[in-house]
């Protein structure tokens, strides 16, 4: 089993994302071969989620933890923390490692 790799691309001093908080993010996701499979930036529509409650893949729930508003990270997410043996929607193959660049836009109180 692989482990989540978190690389801070841009640190910030805004409010911190913690479990149970609602956050708004921008993201772009790629497969290991460089194939882009999704991007909120391309749609110009950020995503709002509640962190740490299973609304998103485990790699996101853990990868956004401790991040601060305005920060950017690269998350390399092993299959077990992504979509596993099933893949997703015909776009993400089974057992795929996922690479995301994410930006934390807002942490709500």
UniProtKB/Swiss-Prot annotation:
Signal peptide: none annotated. Keywords: Isomerase, Rotamase. Residues 20-108 form the PPIase FKBP-type domain. Its EC number is 5.2.1.8. GO terms for biological process: protein folding. SUPFAM superfamilies: FKBP-like. It catalyses: [protein]-peptidylproline (omega=180) = [protein]-peptidylproline (omega=0). Pfam families: FKBP_C (PF00254). GO terms for molecular function: peptidyl-prolyl cis-trans isomerase activity. It comes from the Bacteria. InterPro entries: PPIase_dom_sf, PPIase_FKBP_dom. PPIases accelerate the folding of proteins. Belongs to the FKBP-type PPIase family. This is FK506-binding protein. The lineage of its organism: Bacteria, Pseudomonadati, Pseudomonadota, Betaproteobacteria, Neisseriales. The gene is fbp.
